[in-house]
Amino acid sequence: MRFRFLEAIPVLVVTLLALSINTTFSQNAEPQIEEISVIGQFVPDEKRGTDQVSNVVGQEQFTRSGDANIAESLKRVSGLSTVGGKYVYVRGLGERYSTALMNGAILPSPEPINRVVPMDLFPTAILESVLVQKTYSAAFPAEFGGGVMQLRTKKSTDEFFWNVTSSIGGQNNTTFKDGFTLDGGSRDWLGYDDGHRAMSDTLKRAVAGDNKLKKYSVYDKQGVPMEDLTAIGKAFNNEYTFDSESLPVDTSFTTSFGNFNEIGDSRAKINYFGAIDYSNSWDSNEVQQNRWVPAGGEILSQQEELNFQGTENSVDLSGIFSVGLDLNENHNVRLTSLVLRKMDHRLSRTLGYIESSDDLERVELEWIERELSSHQLQGDHYFPEFNELVINWRYSDIEANRDSPDHRIYRYDGGELSSRGNGNQRNYSFLTDTTEDFGLDVSMVFYGPANATITTKFGGVISEKDRDSEIRRYGFAFGGPISYDLDLLQQPLETIFAPENIGPEGFYIREITRATDNYTAQNELNAFYGEVEFNFDDRLRFTLGARQEDFTQTADTFDLFNPTYGVQAKLEQDALMPAFSATFINNDHQFRLAYSETVSRPDFRELSPAMFTNPMTGTEVVGNPNLKITDIKNYDFRWEWYFGYTDYVSAGIFYKEFTNPIEASIQSPINRVMTFINAASAENQGVEVEVFKTLDFLGDLGEDFYFQGNVSYIDSTVTIAPEDRGVLTSMTRPLQGQSDWLLNAQIGYEPFSGTTATLLYHYYGDRVSQVGIETVPDFYEQAFGELNFVFIRELNDNWRVTAKAKNITDQRNEVRVSDYLVNGYFMGREISLQVDYTF
């Protein structure tokens, strides 16, 4: 399939360019004055002009709020929240119910078990805007529950500009305070490992061809001789203990530029845009962690008490370049290439007691590189003489990677190195997820009776996705008498695993990779849609649409060392999904109504019956091959009132009904392995209110001030069937990660003097963070509020200064089960100073 549509792209491009060039020459002829008809009205707000319930966040809001990435910015949209600092929940629904697109193309994910790309990967510096559409329309993928997030990258420009931005900042609990550090490679400051953490050459040679690293056995004549194992063990970097030193300030740098060139005497021109964004930040946290077990009735007994201390160094490095060919105002072709990178270097130590150890010390050293690279070729063509024919096409080749080299984990029990199988580990994992996508959208306009404007639209998408995930795990095994020397086992690991202690008399390296650690997966989507909009005199609009999707997905879990062992999970669907929306416009009031039927499909690993370990959480997970696709019915109503030039108020209600919703479950009280089930039913309903109002009613005092806010109340219920309950405590509960209340408020000061000041408040209510088991209630992340302040001063036409203060109140983040604390920590207050210069 891939090669068929790849071969078709040049034909399509050449054909459209030929038509465009012909149109260009025609337009260059002597112009003729024709009748001018007014068929619409000026729409200052994109969400006002659309036929769907939506929100748009653009550059103006990015600047006002001072948000560095899209995950921070989207939580300010009504009904949206951010979980874990990077996953966006729309109307309380998790990432499985949301779709992320970039310039129309489906995005792959660098995360091993998450289908949606984390939004913290996208800096606001490279994006023009983000459309969040909360009602379904047939032009978008049918995997839709909460909404679709359409990320729009910055485009080439029609004028010259060059901007440079630099900032410094810090946190009160991190900057100039002692934190964990560990020397690495020469390119760590760029977020690239230079090979310092890579497998040694001796290890690479030993495991080449998917060979397993194990001690030679005289029985099966397989394995590696002890002298070679000794050499391999000594070749590992003997670095386990990190330093404690004062942490530096956070820094960032961004530059963007653009220009255009005309092509001869024609109306054609080439324009281009480029940007580079870099940031280097530090974050230290101390987290209290507790575990509770039933003690009779509603009383819980503490089984674990731990103190987590960690430092994270994050480096973001992104670049984008876009070049466009505008043949005239009606025809353009654009090529956009970008690379988004985020490195997280995490060092942590956990101390305390657990069920199996009264004196535990657990240390983790983790380096993760995430990258998304994209190349997109797009064309937009408008033929007004052919019933206002519009043809938009795109081809995208996008790849997401996650690389975690030499992830080290070790623990001491009672002051001695643990002899458990997982007492010391050095893991290497790599994931690549590629998507190739071709899309076509065509629309035409016709005119009917009763001043009706009929817009027909049809198109299709052919998308192919391939994922390859590999993990190799190693650890030092206890062998000879040296490895049981109690005095030695109480020393730092650099002493325990010193070269003289590696060998037949001491420790030897072995492979502990699991049979289900590695998998490949693919899915293919062939989709076609049709849509008709009836617009009666810009007063009443009806949109009817349907989307046909042919979907196939396979996931193959395999044992690297036993080719005969493998488990395949397969999912197929061929379905038609309808969508309907209506808008009634009465002067400055709009009333919207929408209904649609959509789906949510199981992800790659959720279907596979092979047990695997989530490399991000360490949780044991096994899929369910009997999972069914979730069917969703969506109902929406919204009223909007636009008054003044920018002021508006809107209020809406929504209701969603789920058949066979997919939920996490724990089936066994012994091994507590997570799996997935189809719950009996689920409902999600809520109310959303938004307002933007200038405070000019206060007279001269308020004419430079505005208030912007939104509030959402969301109520959801998931019902678990008795046969699927397992050891879950609750048979009914809210959706995991869904807050009942979401609130955003902004008060801004924007005079014409070049000064801007914005006070922002974000609040989310209690939300289920983990389902309870064995009569322990569900775990709830407690309600949290964040207060930020952004001050911007334009000194002249070239210089601008921005000061930011984030999380001013520094409320404690807590997770509780009933009244018992599970974990708690302070994020810290953050301040920064930014300087912009525009040439």
How would you label these PLM feature ranges?
Residues 109, 121-167, 215, 838:
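A beta-strand signature from Gram-negative outer-membrane beta-barrel systems
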Residues 538-542, 648, 653-658, 673-770:
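Gram-negative outer-membrane beta-barrel transporters
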Residues 35-65, 95-101, 105, 110:
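N-terminal periplasmic "start-of-domain" segments of outer-membrane beta-barrel proteins
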Residues 76-78, 105-134, 154, 179-180, ...:
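Short acidic/polar hinge/loop motifs at secondary-structure boundaries
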Residues 105-106, 343-345, 401-404, 466-469, ...:
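Surface-exposed extracellular loop regions of Gram-negative outer-membrane beta-barrel proteins
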Residues 424-431, 440-447, 453-457, 580, ...:
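Conserved C-terminal beta-signal and adjacent last beta-strands/turns
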Residues 419-420, 431, 435-441, 487-494, ...:
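Outer membrane beta-barrel strand-and-loop segments of large Gram-negative receptors
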Residues 206-348, 371-375, 578-581:
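Transmembrane beta-barrel wall of Gram-negative outer-membrane proteins
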